[in-house]
């Protein structure tokens, strides 16, 4: 095939594949089989390899991925991506309608749309071609994830229409369908990795992956819900949605134009039940003023638009019988009861297990063998039991007692004064405690050792190759290559990951060794205060209490940990292995600014765009301090969703400034 023939065939394949993509994703119909489509796509990929000059930016082959992004560029949004005000009640929706009518002076038409639970994305098109895709970020700036978004087959790489603006922006929700979410978790379980918490977290993590080839395999999808351009060509939001569909974007058919607030309530009542039939996670309904001119007139507050509000669904609940209760032992020795349930469909997934937390919770529920219980699922992996349907209790059934001995090593359990949990004290001989400590050691927030999962740790423990975390640094190629499922590449990855972990900062090592009550934040404070493991080991209880945020419970735990000979030997073994057990000069924290100097913060709840650790880093980098509790000396409480009401109430009583996520970012950027 010569150049002219190759170019002609590549252009033909581009046209044909775009046509069939549009049929499948926008019109829900097909003219060829998946096999025929894949054959054409593979032909295109091979031709583009042979004739790379003819590879087009909008080629369907670009959805396959393969681009590796080392670092995501931070991009300013042309139009800020503000959060919506939330409501959970019909009364507040009626109040919203009253505010809108009062502001504009007449009755208003609304559009109601499903609020899909995924990751908000902004996509810019120039001359009909996808130009850039940016995450929501803090609403002002986000990350450039264009290569990853191009792998989503329902997002057009090129507008399949004769007319479109020279430049425009669309916004949508990237999500992971339940089916794919469960498949990914099954694959992770098969290789001994922890399950992903929920589809939203999975989608968020996938969008930020460095390798777009892996992103492509996860089959993300996207519903587009907004069109932005410098001059609106459509009079209403509903007309804009229709225009988006015409251009080839995937728009949910679930939206409805509502003439009044009563129709909004009917829509909510309908989807409160029907949403469970959808193949993806939803967490509410978005209500928008339909008239785009009125949207402009109503404008924005500092945090959210005045012309829209989000109604949030309550957590779903289902009832099912308890089949049995099993007990799990964690790395600290804490014993957690878990109920095995008759399978029940809940929040889009099949639930078979629910946590019972501890003995106090079992006593509160007054659980009996065979009880039917109500199960609620928020964002957790394992749902929780909220109450018992006593009316269905089997006559003569026995109360389920909490066990007295460890379910693994049969050691008698103990209870620490002031704690709800029961513990197995056999921390040097109880297998799940030993492997749990090693799993904790290798995790991303600790030593971040690639190539090792929980299944590998179990195997190494069974083969008596490891008995503590220091043993990881004695593993050899010859030992690993003999193990099942270990090839040359996987052995090399494991050994490289272990070697690289020797450069892990001291604060992370201190967290990784697993002293009780020393989480990542406390470990960082201890590392900055004492500078080395030697100084920490020698510290008296009085000296420990002088460190920031260190109370008597943590201080006593540290003293107790270093009083155990095997722990002292562990530190010596880690030193010999070359692990960093002191701060280097450049690790001594020097704030990048003094914006928050002298200010203390508590962070609580779940946030839309940041992990709590990321918010803590921002505070520390700007000279602020992280506090562990609400006191009169606290300056700010950064409050996310699902934070404890007692903490919020205490902060309000003490007149502490309470910041939302957006308000915190605004304060940071001011």
Curated annotation (Swiss-Prot):
GO terms for cellular component: cytosol. It comes from the Bacteria. NAD(+) binds at residues 34-38, 83-84, 113, 136, 173, 288, 312. It catalyses: NAD(+) + (deoxyribonucleotide)n-3'-hydroxyl + 5'-phospho-(deoxyribonucleotide)m = (deoxyribonucleotide)n+m + AMP + beta-nicotinamide D-nucleotide. Keywords: DNA damage, DNA repair, DNA replication, Ligase, Magnesium, Manganese, Metal-binding, NAD, Zinc. Disulfide bonds: none annotated. Gene3D superfamilies: 5' to 3' exonuclease, C-terminal subdomain, 6.20.10.30, BRCT domain, DNA ligase/mRNA capping enzyme, Helix hairpin bin, Nucleic acid-binding proteins. One of its GO terms (biological process) is DNA repair. Residues 591-670 form the BRCT domain. Its EC number is 6.5.1.2. Its cofactor is Mg(2+); Mn(2+). Zn(2+) binds at residues 406, 409, 424, 430. CDD domains: BRCT_DNA_ligase_like (cd17748), LIGANc (cd00114). InterPro entries: BRCT_dom, BRCT_dom_sf, DisA/LigA_HHH, DNA_ligase, DNA_ligase_CS, DNAligase_adenylation, DNAligase_N, Hlx-hairpin-Hlx_DNA-bd_motif. One of its GO terms (molecular function) is DNA binding. The active site is at 115 (n6-amp-lysine intermediate). PANTHER family: CHROMOSOME TRANSMISSION FIDELITY FACTOR 18 (PTHR23389), DNA LIGASE (PTHR23389:SF9). DNA ligase that catalyzes the formation of phosphodiester linkages between 5'-phosphoryl and 3'-hydroxyl groups in double-stranded DNA using NAD as a coenzyme and as the energy source for the reaction. It is essential for DNA replication and repair of damaged DNA. Belongs to the NAD-dependent DNA ligase family. LigA subfamily. This is DNA ligase.
